[in-house]
């Protein structure tokens, strides 16, 4: 039996609704500060590269006051009292990736990581492969898709006198992972889980569908963004088009893959995308 949704709001959420009206019942938190993640947790080189490439702004040529103003207006940083902290979106995209010890994301926002596991069977044991990803976006998406590819057994088909391998559906998995990281509920303290079995691959995203959105509406391209700032940065990095076409694109790609099926469902406080694999793919596992 499914649990009832928890609509508990804090005082900030209530004040937002009073100020902005009923549309604010969708409470966005991706512009809020991450506790203890100060400006020293920022990957300044990535920030500079981003602004130069996307906005043609050279941060090397502006003073510190102007630089802070730009980062605050971009919702990468947020002032709290007399200090600057990374926002949730700021640490997700521009958190420092350290060579040793923890990355900024793992240190200050660990439940935003992505867990990838390959299981031998339905008993969840033994585990063939396991990977915890705490890279910033969008690099984390590339790393997870790469791990799926490494564990992907490629079937082949005979065409004429030649054996041709069926290519790995990289764009499909990229779209599935992008959909998960942009629409998950970051207030829930659990990671996105990607579980690989012989007959299916599950992408488990923390959080209910937003408000009146249903699975059928999603299939029709109707969506309400839970994390508009994250979606905006995904768009800037060319990983999303912000047009609500993610699920329709996924459905179209799956229809182009004979023997594959995709299933979407809500399970308690999680959203699941389950890619069912054809028998010839299962036999290779």
Regions found by a protein language model. Name each.
Residues 1-284:
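Conserved N-terminal catalytic/coupling substructures associated with nucleotide/phosphate chemistry
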């Amino acid at each position: 039996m499914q649990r009832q949704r928890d609509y508990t709001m804090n005082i900030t959420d209530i004040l937002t609704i009073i100020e902005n009206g009923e549309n604010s019942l969708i409470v966005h938190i991706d512009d809020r500060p991450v506790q203890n993640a100060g400006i020293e947790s920022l990957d300044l080189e990535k920030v500079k590269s981003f602004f130069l490439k996307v906005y043609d702004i050279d941060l090397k040529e502006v003073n510190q006051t102007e630089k802070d103003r730009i980062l605050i207006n971009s919702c990468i940083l947020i002032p709290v009292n007399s200090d600057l902290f990374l926002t949730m979106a700021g640490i997700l995209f521009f958190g420092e990736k350290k060579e040793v010890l923890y990355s900024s994301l793992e240190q200050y926002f660990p439940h935003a990581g992505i867990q990838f596991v390959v299981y031998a069977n339905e008993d969840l044991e033994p585990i063939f492969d396991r990977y915890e990803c705490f890279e910033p976006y969008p690099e984390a998406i590339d790393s997870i898709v790469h791990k799926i590819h490494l564990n992907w057994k490629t079937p082949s088909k005979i065409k004429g006198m030649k054996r041709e391998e069926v290519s790995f559906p990289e764009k499909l998995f990229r779209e599935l992972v992008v959909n998960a990281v942009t629409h998950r509920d970051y207030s829930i303290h659990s990671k996105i889980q990607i579980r690989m079995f012989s007959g299916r691959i599950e992408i488990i995203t923390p959080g209910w569908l937003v408000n009146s959105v249903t699975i059928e509406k999603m299939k029709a391209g109707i969506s309400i963004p839970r994390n508009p700032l994250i979606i905006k940065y995904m768009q800037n990095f060319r990983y999303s088009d912000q047009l609500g076409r993610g699920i329709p694109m996924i459905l179209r790609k799956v229809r182009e893959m004979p023997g594959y099926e995709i299933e979407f469902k809500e399970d308690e406080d999680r959203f699941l995308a389950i890619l069912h694999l054809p028998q010839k793919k299962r036999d290779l596992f």
